[in-house]
Swiss-Prot record:
Stretch list, region G4: 541-544
Keywords: Cytoplasm, GTP-binding, Initiation factor, Nucleotide-binding, Protein biosynthesis
One Gene Ontology cellular component annotation held by this UniProt entry: cytosol
Extent of Low complexity compositional bias: 50-67, 129-141, 309-318
Protein name, as recorded: Translation initiation factor IF-2
Classification lineage: Bacteria, Bacillati, Bacillota, Bacilli, Lactobacillales
Annotated function: One of the essential components for the initiation of protein synthesis. Protects formylmethionyl-tRNA from spontaneous hydrolysis and promotes its binding to the 30S ribosomal subunits. Also involved in the hydrolysis of GTP during the formation of the 70S ribosomal complex.
Gene3D superfamilies for the chain: 1.10.10.2480, P-loop containing nucleotide triphosphate hydrolases, Translation factors, Translation initiation factor IF- 2, domain 3
An example Gene Ontology molecular-function term: translation initiation factor activity
Cross-referenced NCBIfam families: IF-2, small_GTP
Predominant location category: cytoplasm
Protein localization: Cytoplasm
Length: 930
C-alpha cells in the first residue's frame, strides 16, 4: 500500500501541519514531524478525526435563497473567516418554491472576498506592529547587554537572533499555508472547463452536413443524366451517342459555371475561443513586500531554479527530437529526393573574353563540375573560378552544340572611336561647314603678316622676336562664307605644333618667301600636309621685294613634289604681298574653290567632338583650352571629356573675345571649367551627363598613368652598359613654366635635343602657368634652375627664390633659351687641355754641384724654353723622363725663358741623370674651347 506524508494530509484537509501532527500523536501514532509518512488507512483515520461528529448526512433540501454579499460581510469576522462561515450555516431555510428550478452554479462574489481579505490583512498588520514593537524592545535590550556584557552577552544575542529568525520563518510558513488553502477552495469552486475538441467536432460535422445537402441535388442531376445516356446508348447509333455525350458535357459545364458563380451560403462562424476570465488577486499582504534578508534570497533562488529547470526541460525535448533518437521512426522509408529540372541548352551564347567557368555554367544552366570535366577532356585544366579566353569558350560551345558569338563591348572612355567611325552621324542632317585652313611655312616668311592682313588686325606686332609662339585660331567671312584659319609657328622647335595643325585642317596654305625660296621648315610643312592627305595652296609672298623670283620658288617646290596646276600638278599657286594686301582676294577665292571641291559637311545635331588647339592655365579662370569643333554643336554647361581630364563648359568665348553660348562645326572657341589643363592635340567629346563624363575622364587618367608606368625603362643586360655610362654624365636639371602647352612641349623637345658631349638635360617638371612657390621648392630640392617662357614669378616665389638662392631665367624668344642653355651645359664640363710643344734644346755640358744636383748646359735649337713649361728628356729617340723645371738661368741670372739660338742652364726637378746630347723638349697644356 502506498503511504502519505502528514503535510499532504494537512493540505487535503485544509489544516496546518502542526494540527495534523498533534492529532496523529493524540491518536497514538509515532510521528515526529510533518514529513513523517503513514499508511493510507491511517491517513483516512486521521482525516476522519477532523470531521465533526454531529454532522450526519442530511437529505437534499431545497435551494437556499441567495444571500447578498453585504450580509455575508456583516456576519463574517475578519480575524477568523472560517468560523464565520460555520456560523452562517444554521440559517433557517426558506420555503421552497412550487416551481421546479434547474440547479445553477452559484457565482462568486469577488468584491465581498476582496473586502474580507482587506479586513484580514488590516488585522494582521496590527498584530505585526505589536510584534515589531516587541522585537524593537528586545533589540534595545540586546544593545544594553552588548554594552555591559562580554562574551556571555554576545552568545545571548546570537541565541535571541536565532530564535527571532525561527519565529519569523514560522510566521511566513503559516501565511503561505493559509494562501494555499484559500487557492484550493477557489479552484474547487471554479466553473467547469469547456471541451473545445467536442465543440470543434460538432462544428465540422455541421459543415459536412451542409456541404452534403448542397451537393445532393447536383449529384442527383448528374446521376439521372448518366442513366438516361446509358439507356439511349442501347438503341442509338455510335454517331448519335457521341453527339448526345457532347451536349451533356456542355450542359454539365454550364451547370458547373453557375455553381461556381453563385457562392454557397455559409453560417457565421461561431467563436469557440475560450474567453479570458478574471483571475482573483493573489492573497499577498504588504508585509511580504517589506521582507528582506533570508526571505528575499529564498525567493530569488526559487526563481533561478525555475528558469534552470525550464532550460533543462527544453534541452531534453530538443535532444529527443534530434535525428536518430526517435526509435519508432527508424524503419520508416526515407523521403523521395526531388529530381532536378532539366533545362534545355540555349541556341546562341554571347561571351566576352575572361569569363569564368562559373559564369558560363550559370548562363547555359549546367553544373560547373560538368564544364570542368569537358575542359579536362579537351586538355584544359581549369577551376570554376578560372577565367577562359575567347578561343577556349568557342571550343566549349562547339562541344555543347551552341553557336558562340563574341559580345562587342563599347568602351565609354574611348573617345577616339568618334574620329574613326562616322556611323553615329545622321545623313539627313548633314550641312556644309566652313573649311579649316592652316597657314604653314618657314620662320619670318610672312605667315602671321598674311593672317594679320586677313583679319585686319596687328597680331604680328605683339609677337616677341617677330615669330609666332603658339597656335592661334581665327575665323573670317568671305562672300558670305566663313573660313577658319590656324596659324602655326615656323620655328624649328615647333614641329609637333605644325603636325597637330595639319591633322585638324582641311586645306594648307604654304607661305614661301619669293626672295628666300624653299627652306627647311618649308619642306617639313610639305611632309606634314602630305602625311595628313591635305591639299596645298602655295602663297608666294614678298613679291614686292626687289630680289623676288617666283619662278625659282615654283621650280624648287616641284623638286619636293608640289606641282602647280599650270605644270600639270594639283596644287594652286597664288603670288601675293601680305604687307601691301596684294592678291589677297584671289587667295581667299582659291580657298573657297578648293573647299567646294572637297564637299566638306558636318552634322550639327549630334554631340560635339573636336581637337584641342591650345591649352593654358590662367590665374583667375583656371584651365583654359582652345577647342576646334569638328562635328556637332558645343553648348555652355555641356559635360565634356578633354584628353585625360573632364569638366563642364562653364564659359565659352570666340576668337574676338566675345562670350557665346553655341559653337557649331569648324568653330574655334576658348572654354573654361576643366579640372586640369589638357595637352595640345588631345581630342574632346561631349557626354550625355556629368556622371558618365566623370567616369570616362577618371578611367582615361587611370589608363594614362598605367601606360606611363609601363613605359618606365628597366635595366637589362643589353642596356646595362649604356645605363652605367649615362651615370657618369653630368646633368642639368631644368624646370620649365610657359604660358601655353605648345610652348612647353617645344621648349622641352628643344632642350633635350641639345648635343653637348658629357652633359645631358633633365626636365624635372614642366607645366603651364606662372612660377609659384612650389616650383621654387622643387628647384631647391632637385638643384635645378627655372626657365620661365612668357610667364613671371609671383612675389612670394621671387622672395623665396632669393632666400633659397634658386636661379630663375625669364625669356620670350625660344632660340635665346636654347643658346643660353648650351652655354650653361658647356660651362659644366671639366676643362679640356691639349699639349703644345713650344721648343727644343740640346745638352752641351753637365755640371754636378754637391747638395744641389746636376746642372745641364743647353742651347735652344727650336722655339723657346720657358720657366713654367714642362720638359721631356729624350735620349736616342726614347723619352727617359717627363717632369718640370726646377730652375732656369742665363749665365748667372734667373730668367723666365730662353729663346732660340741662345744658351742657358737648367735643372730638372727630381731628376739628375742628365747626359750630353740629351734632347730637352719643352711643352705647355692649353685649354681647348668647346
Amino acid at each position: 500500500m502506498s503511504k502519505k506524508r502528514l503535510y499532504e494530509i494537512a493540505k487535503e484537509l485544509g489544516k496546518e501541519s502542526k494540527e495534523v501532527v498533534a492529532r496523529a500523536k493524540e491518536l497514538g501514532l509515532d510521528v515526529k514531524s510533518h514529513s513523517s509518512s503513514v499508511e493510507e488507512a491511517v491517513a483516512a483515520k486521521i482525516a476522519a478525526s477532523f470531521k465533526p461528529a454531529a454532522a450526519p448526512k442530511v437529505e437534499a433540501k431545497p435551494a437556499a435563497p441567495k444571500v447578498s454579499a453585504e450580509k455575508k460581510a456583516e456576519k463574517s469576522e475578519p480575524a477568523k473567516p472560517a468560523v464565520a462561515k460555520e456560523e452562517a450555516k444554521p440559517a433557517e431555510p426558506v420555503a421552497p418554491k412550487t416551481e421546479k428550478v434547474a440547479a445553477k452554479p452559484q457565482s462568486r462574489n469577488f468584491k465581498a472576498e476582496r473586502e474580507a481579505r482587506a479586513k484580514e490583512q488590516a488585522e494582521r498588520r496590527k498584530q505585526n506592529k505589536g510584534n515589531n514593537r516587541d522585537q524593537q524592545q528586545n533589540g534595545n535590550r540586546q544593545k544594553n547587554d552588548g554594552r555591559n556584557g562580554g562574551k556571555q552577552g554576545q552568545s545571548n544575542r546570537d541565541n535571541r537572533r536565532f530564535n527571532d529568525q525561527a519565529k519569523k520563518q514560522q510566521g511566513q510558513q503559516k501565511r503561505r499555508n493559509e494562501r494555499r488553502q484559500q487557492e484550493d477552495k477557489r479552484s474547487n469552486q471554479a466553473a467547469p472547463r469547456i471541451d473545445f475538441k467536442a465543440r470543434a467536432a460538432a462544428l465540422k460535422a455541421e459543415q459536412n452536413a451542409e456541404y452534403a445537402r448542397s451537393s445532393e441535388e447536383r449529384f442527383k442531376q448528374y446521376q439521372a443524366a448518366k442513366e438516361a445516356l446509358a439507356q439511349a446508348n442501347k438503341r442509338k447509333e455510335p454517331e448519335e451517342i457521341f453527339e448526345e455525350a457532347a451536349k451533356l458535357a456542355e450542359q454539365a459545364q454550364q451547370v458547373q459555371a453557375v455553381v461556381e458563380v453563385v457562392p454557397e451560403k455559409k453560417e457565421p462562424a461561431v467563436d469557440t475561443r475560450r474567453k479570458k476570465q478574471a483571475r482573483p488577486d493573489k492573497n499577498r499582504d504588504d508585509y511580504d513586500h517589506e521582507e528582506d534578508g533570508p526571505r528575499k534570497q529564498q525567493k530569488n533562488r526559487s526563481s533561478q531554479n525555475q528558469v534552470r529547470n525550464q532550460k533543462n526541460s527544453n534541452w531534453n525535448n530538443n535532444k529527443k527530437n534530434k535525428k536518430g533518437n526517435n526509435k519508432n521512426n527508424r524503419n520508416q522509408t526515407p523521403k523521395p529526393v526531388t529530381e532536378r529540372k532539366f533545362h534545355e541548352l540555349p541556341t546562341e551564347f554571347e561571351y566576352t573574353d575572361g569569363m569564368t567557368v562559373a559564369e558560363i555554367a550559370k548562363r547555359i544552366k549546367r553544373e560547373p563540375a560538368e564544364i570542368v570535366k569537358k575542359l579536362f577532356m579537351m586538355g584544359v585544366m581549369a577551376t570554376q573560378n578560372q577565367s577562359l579566353d575567347g578561343e577556349t569558350i568557342e571550343l566549349l560551345m562547339v562541344d555543347y552544340g551552341i553557336e558562340a558569338k563574341q559580345k562587342v563591348e563599347v568602351d565609354n572612355a574611348d573617345i577616339e572611336r568618334f574620329f574613326v567611325e562616322d556611323g553615329y552621324l545622321n545623313e539627313d542632317e548633314l550641312v556644309e561647314r566652313p573649311p579649316v585652313v592652316t597657314i604653314m611655312g618657314h620662320v619670318d616668311h610672312g605667315k602671321t603678316t598674311l593672317l594679320d592682313t586677313l583679319r585686319n588686325s596687328r597680331v604680328a606686332t605683339g609677337e616677341a622676336g617677330g615669330i609666332t609662339q603658339h597656335i592661334g585660331a581665327y575665323q573670317i567671312v568671305e562672300n558670305g562664307k566663313k573660313i577658319t584659319f590656324l596659324d602655326t609657328p615656323g620655328h624649328a622647335a615647333f614641329t609637333s605644333m605644325r603636325a597637330r595643325g595639319a591633322s585638324v585642317t582641311d586645306i594648307t596654305i604654304l607661305v614661301v618667301a619669293a626672295d628666300d625660296g624653299v627652306m627647311p621648315q618649308t619642306i617639313e610643312a610639305i611632309n606634314h600636309s602630305k602625311a595628313a592627305n591635305v591639299p596645298i595652296i602655295v602663297a608666294i609672298n614678298k613679291i614686292d621685294k626687289p630680289g623676288a623670283n617666283p619662278e625659282r620658288v615654283i621650280g624648287e617646290l616641284a623638286e619636293h613634289g608640289v606641282m602647280s596646276t599650270a605644270w600639270g600638278g594639283d596644287s594652286e599657286f597664288v603670288e601675293i604681298s601680305a604687307k601691301f594686301n596684294q592678291n589677297i582676294e584671289e587667295l581667299l577665292e582659291t580657298v573657297l574653290l578648293v573647299a567646294e571641291i572637297q564637299e566638306l559637311k558636318a552634322d550639327p545635331t549630334v554631340r560635339a567632338i573636336g581637337t584641342v588647339i591650345e591649352a593654358r592655365l590662367d590665374k583667375g579662370k583656371g584651365a583654359v583650352a582652345t577647342l576646334l569643333v569638328q562635328q556637332g554643336t558645343l553648348n555652355v554647361q555641356d559635360p565634356i571629356v578633354v584628353g585625360n581630364t573632364f569638366g563642364r563648359v562653364r564659359a565659352m568665348t570666340n576668337d574676338l573675345g566675345r562670350r557665346v553660348k553655341v559653337a557649331g562645326p569648324s568653330t574655334p572657341v576658348s572654354i573654361t571649367g576643366l579640372n586640369e589643363a589638357p595637352m595640345a592635340g588631345d581630342h574632346f567629346a561631349v557626354y550625355e551627363d556629368e556622371k558618365s563624363a566623370r567616369a570616362a575622364g577618371e578611367e582615361r587618367a587611370k589608363r594614362a598613368l598605367m601606360k606611363q608606368r609601363q613605359a618606365t625603362q628597366r635595366v637589362s643586360l643589353e642596356n646595362l652598359f649604356d645605363t652605367l655610362k649615362a651615370g657618369e654624365l653630368k646633368s642639368v636639371n631644368v624646370i620649365i613654366k610657359a604660358d601655353v602647352q605648345g610652348s612647353v612641349e617645344a621648349l622641352s623637345a628643344s632642350l633635350q635635343k641639345i648635343d653637348v658631349e658629357g652633359v645631358k638635360v633633365t626636365i624635372v617638371h614642366s607645366a603651364v602657368g606662372a612660377i609659384n612657390e612650389s616650383d621654387v621648392t622643387l628647384a631647391e630640392a632637385s638643384n635645378a634652375f627655372i626657365v620661365g617662357f612668357n610667364v613671371r614669378p609671383t612675389p612670394q616665389a621671387r622672395q623665396q627664390a632669393e632666400a633659397d638662392d634658386v636661379e630663375i631665367r625669364l625669356h620670350s624668344i625660344i632660340y635665346k633659351v636654347i643658346e643660353e642653355m648650351e652655354e650653361a651645359m658647356k660651362g659644366m664640363l671639366d676643362p679640356e687641355f691639349e699639349e703644345k710643344v713650344i721648343g727644343e734644346a740640346v745638352i752641351r755640358e753637365t755640371f754636378k754641384v754637391s747638395k744641389v744636383g746636376t746642372i745641364g748646359g743647353f742651347m735652344v735649337i727650336n722655339g723657346k724654353v720657358a720657366r713654367d713649361s714642362k720638359v721631356r728628356v729624350i735620349r736616342d729617340g726614347v723619352v727617359i723622363y717627363d717632369g718640370e723645371l726646377a730652375s732656369l738661368k742665363h749665365y748667372k741670372d734667373d730668367v723666365k725663358e730662353v729663346t732660340n739660338g741662345r744658351e742657358g742652364g737648367l735643372m730638372i726637378d727630381g731628376y739628375n741623370d742628365i747626359k750630353m746630347d740629351d734632347v730637352i723638349e719643352a711643352y705647355v697644356m692649353e685649354e681647348i674651347k668647346r
